[in-house]
């Protein structure tokens, strides 16, 4: 309790709850007007709070719960309790057979090897695939139910519970999520339900080696009493940062070609030549040509013209602009290389 109080300084649960509700409404207005929020219901605090927030934001008729037990789930009554409390529609999809079938197919092809991490993470990824199958079928948006504390130490499965279309709780600690759950009037047994790993029955805090209260205080204040715990948290955070980043991608930049004009050349001739070259290599595609006029290093005007192989591109007006200009930059937006035309 001491740690929770220290991490909750100046946290206004009602104001934050109202802000999230407004944000959810705005998200759906812009990214799925008329769609339903699809929430994976585990019966824990995170899915309970997200579902309740969506009900307040969209109405219970626009929230659909998906219960996804892996075989027999001893605590599934908590999930039923939540959907009944909120009055939302739901379905139950048992993922056990999907997991078993994949393991049966993959394991023999990998030298009969099946890692512990695979067993831990595959159910989360099967659940996310299930949520998207439901969402696309009914016309919905999948809610991510991760919180800041779990994300901070990598306690989420990439492309599993770490996926989703919108994330109401990802900037809030476990302690703060609980406070919002109480503000929403959720039953205390759902707010305080202890999460387990679903494999050995160990709690999250057993596996982490520290409590969420300690972690939350450290995240919000930078304060921690035990230096060994601090080192453990810092190591886990650094090791798992990649889960929160966009997928690395190769950066490709179009090459820039510079043409130096003498006094006898005109911008019109050079531009026409490059447009013709583009058409020869790109068949019948139109190209957008951006003409940027610059004096003394400052941009003064920028025109955009569509050049079509069916309609001869006319840039004769460039001749009037060319007098006294330092350079004209011509860029083909749809794939043509950047062309900088400089006058001697």
Where are these regions (language model features)?
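Conserved Ser/Thr-centered positions that define the repeating blades of beta-propeller domains
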Residues: 292-294
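Short, surface-exposed alpha-helical segments at coil->helix boundaries
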Residues: 47-51, 76-80
């Amino acid at each position: 309790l001491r740690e929770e109080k220290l991490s909750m300084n100046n946290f206004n649960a009602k104001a934050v709850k109202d802000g999230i509700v407004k944000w959810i409404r705005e998200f759906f207005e812009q990214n799925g007007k008329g769609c339903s929020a699809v929430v994976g219901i585990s019966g824990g605090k995170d899915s309970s709070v997200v579902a309740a927030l969506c009900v307040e934001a969209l109405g219970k008729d626009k929230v659909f719960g998906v219960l996804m037990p892996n075989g027999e789930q001893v605590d599934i009554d908590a999930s039923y309790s939540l959907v009944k409390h909120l009055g939302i529609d739901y379905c139950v999809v048992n993922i056990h057979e999907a997991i078993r079938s994949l393991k049966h197919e993959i394991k023999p092809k990998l030298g009969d090897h099946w890692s512990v991490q695979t067993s831990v993470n595959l159910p989360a990824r099967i659940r996310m695939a299930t949520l998207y199958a439901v969402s696309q079928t009914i016309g919905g948006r999948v809610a991510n139910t991760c919180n800041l504390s779990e994300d901070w130490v990598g306690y989420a499965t990439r492309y599993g519970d770490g996926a989703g279309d919108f994330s109401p709780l990802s900037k809030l600690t476990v302690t703060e999520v609980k406070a919002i759950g109480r503000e929403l009037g959720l039953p205390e047994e759902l707010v305080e339900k202890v999460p387990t790993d679903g494999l050995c029955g160990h709690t999250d805090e057993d596996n982490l080696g520290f409590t969420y209260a300690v972690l939350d205080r450290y995240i919000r204040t930078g304060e921690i009493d035990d230096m060994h715990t601090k080192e453990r948290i810092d190591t886990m955070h650094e090791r798992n940062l990649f889960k929160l980043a966009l997928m690395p991608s190769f950066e490709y930049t179009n090459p820039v070609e510079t043409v130096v004009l003498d006094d006898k050349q005109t911008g019109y001739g050079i531009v026409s030549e490059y447009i013709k070259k583009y058409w020869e290599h790109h068949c019948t595609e139109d190209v957008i040509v951006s003409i940027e006029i610059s004096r003394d290093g400052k941009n003064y005007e920028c025109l955009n013209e569509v050049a079509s192989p069916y309609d001869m591109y006319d840039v004769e007006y460039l001749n009037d602009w060319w007098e006294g200009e330092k350079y004209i930059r011509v860029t083909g937006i749809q794939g043509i290389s950047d062309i900088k035309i400089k006058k001697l």
